[in-house]
Amino acid sequence: MRLWVLAIGSKMPAWVEAGVAEYSARMPPQLRVEWRGLPLARRGRSGDPVRWRREEGERILAATPAGAERIALEVNGRNLDSEALAQRIDTWFHSGRDVALWVGGPDGLDPALQPDWRWSLSPLTLAHPVVRVVLAEQLYRAWSIQAGLPYHRGGEE
């Protein structure tokens, strides 16, 4: 089973690459996370975010593995705490099905995309580079909960 993170934007600062690499390296080989940065739509002076989102949505769909569960990361998606995400990871792992996590560009995701469900990392608006690091850490945290590792100490005083 693989988790595919398909994110619009391919040029990330070094601190983002380092954070993503750190948490990805901690994941077990049987639960690999593949990060794929997809090019932004070419933005001109005319300013047509509908067209940009459509082009980026087409890139996301083209990069999504056939048969993968498709999850859109959106501010209005379902909120999950770390334990609920850990349960979700366990379900994905035991299904054997690949999972594609879609991260839109600066103008969001194309509304025409049809994800299997929508997930919100936070009700806050996060810069796209920050989303990648937070997502990497939360995927690792969820896996560590399932594996019984001491990394997560939620609810302890």
Curated annotation (Swiss-Prot):
Main location as per UniProt: cytoplasm
E.C. code: 2.1.1.177
Subcellular location: Cytoplasm
SUPFAM superfamilies, sorted: alpha/beta knot (SSF75217)
Record keywords: Cytoplasm, Methyltransferase, rRNA processing, S-adenosyl-L-methionine, Transferase
Family membership noted in the UniProt record: Belongs to the RNA methyltransferase RlmH family.
PANTHER family for this protein: METHYLTRANSFERASE, RIBOSOMAL RNA LARGE SUBUNIT METHYLTRANSFERASE H
Organism expressing this protein natively: Acidithiobacillus ferrooxidans (strain ATCC 23270 / DSM 14882 / CIP 104768 / NCIMB 8455)
Entries under Gene3D superfamilies matching the protein: 3.40.1280.10
Described purpose of this protein according to its UniProt entry: Specifically methylates the pseudouridine at position 1915 (m3Psi1915) in 23S rRNA.
One term under GO cellular component: cytoplasm
One Pfam family cited in the UniProt record for this chain: SPOUT_MTase
Name used for this protein in its record: Ribosomal RNA large subunit methyltransferase H
Record's subunit section: Homodimer.
GO MF annotations in UniProt: rRNA (pseudouridine-N3-)-methyltransferase activity
Taxonomic lineage of the native organism: Bacteria, Pseudomonadati, Pseudomonadota, Acidithiobacillia, Acidithiobacillales
InterPro entries membership: Alpha/beta_knot_MTases (IPR029028), RlmH-like (IPR003742), tRNA_m1G_MTases_N (IPR029026)
Reaction catalysis annotation: pseudouridine(1915) in 23S rRNA + S-adenosyl-L-methionine = N(3)-methylpseudouridine(1915) in 23S rRNA + S-adenosyl-L-homocysteine + H(+)
Positions with a binding annotation for S-adenosyl-L-methionine: 73, 104, 121-126
Domain of life of the organism encoding this protein: Bacteria
